[in-house]
């Protein structure tokens, strides 16, 4: 009797929702002991090969031998990583591609100087606005940096005063 009630609930659920309950063996990464999200031979009401998420016997990273979960259509889940890669590629092209294609390295150097200035300001605790319009805004990223790195960063980011003179006099 209970089994028939559960089957009836699943049938009604299938009619309006494209995401179906699945069961089977899944592989992927997860958090916890035996819980994970992965893909594999999940057998849903309509198709084989849905993506499943669930808890079962297995490892937090590895194979879940048996589990229950919710299956999602695979083309939806394959689109998310593709969109992430595309956004990253376009962002990298906007940063490097524009500058390198127009004037070579000459336009990239002010951005590197602005990046160095912002790292130094973040580490030392100053809240100055960057002088360059094209510089990367590091303050928009969540960073947790101690105040001691200001001293360390200033040694790394500033050129030693005698280094340029020594190179020109050696030639």
Curated annotation (Swiss-Prot):
Highest rank taxon of the organism: Eukaryota
| Keywords carried by this UniProt record | Cadmium
Q: Tell me what turns on expression of this protein.
A: By cadmium.
Kindly give the PANTHER family that the UniProt entry links to this protein. Answer: CADMIUM-INDUCED PROTEIN AS8 (PTHR36778:SF1)
Q: Name it.
A: Cadmium-induced protein AS8
């Amino acid at each position: 009797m209970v089994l028939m009630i559960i089957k009836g609930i699943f049938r009604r659920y299938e009619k309006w929702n494209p995401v179906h309950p699945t069961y089977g063996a899944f592989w992927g990464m997860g958090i916890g002991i035996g819980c994970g999200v992965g893909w594999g031979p999940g057998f849903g009401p309509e198709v084989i090969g849905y993506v499943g998420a669930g808890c079962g016997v297995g490892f937090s990273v590895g194979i879940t031998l048996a589990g229950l979960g919710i299956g999602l259509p695979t083309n939806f889940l394959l689109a998310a990583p593709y969109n992430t890669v595309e956004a990253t590629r376009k962002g990298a092209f906007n940063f490097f591609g524009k500058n390198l294609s127009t004037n070579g390295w000459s336009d990239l150097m002010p951005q590197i100087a602005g990046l160095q200035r912002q790292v130094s300001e973040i580490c030392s605790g100053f809240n100055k606005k960057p002088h360059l319009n094209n510089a990367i805004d590091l303050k928009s990223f969540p960073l947790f940096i101690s105040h001691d790195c200001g001293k360390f960063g200033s040694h790394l980011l500033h050129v030693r005063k005698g280094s340029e003179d020594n190179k020109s006099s050696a030639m």
